Design a protein with these regions (language model features):
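DUTPase catalytic domain/fold
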Residues: 1-164
Length: 164
């Protein structure tokens, strides 16, 4: 899939993988702004255009077995999901919304807001890899109200019901 982008900052870095097998693409900060005490907004200097292609969307497992096919012409909403990198623990920062969703209709600069919850630890600076993105999608959902739901072994067991 091709994701088009517009460079909004001369130092913007095209999202990249360190290793070909990596699941997500790293993004690099081109700007930083403290928008409230210990709350930092980082821009990546890029805007995206995310579109489905003319072909069917086919998703396969690692063995090549197809387990989802969305025929051309079916409604599929595509997004980029921005999430923290695993090394975030070294910064004392927390991504404000855990995972940010960049909708396919958004055309502004992609940015991320972090809480610097441990001010004695370093925070991100311009030029740092501040997060990672991956393609996400959702299919249309119709909600149907029923009087009863089917039984399962788990039933209504909620928080902690499956063990430690």
């Amino acid at each position: 899939m091709i994701v088009r982008f517009k460079r909004l900052h001369p130092d913007a870095v095209v999202p990249f993988k360190t290793y070909p097998e990596d699941f997500c693409y790293d993004v690099v900060a081109t700007s930083e702004q403290e928008i409230a005490p210990n709350v930092w907004k980082y821009g990546i200097g890029l805007a995206f255009e995310i579109q489905g292609g003319p072909e069917d969307l086919v998703i396969k497992n690692e063995f090549g077995k197809e387990f989802l096919r969305i025929p051309q012409g079916r409604e599929v909403n595509v997004s980029l999901d921005l999430r923290p990198r695993s090394s975030i623990y070294k910064t004392g920062m927390v991504l404000s919304n855990a995972v940010g969703t960049v909708d396919d209709l958004y055309r502004g600069e992609v940015s991320a807001v972090f809480y610097h919850v441990f001010p004695n630890m370093p925070r991100y600076k311009v030029g740092d890899r501040i997060g990672q993105i991956k393609l996400g999608f959702t299919l249309p959902i119709e909600f149907e109200e029923v009087d009863e739901l089917g039984d399962t072994e788990r039933g209504e067991g909620g928080y902690g019901s499956t063990g430690r």
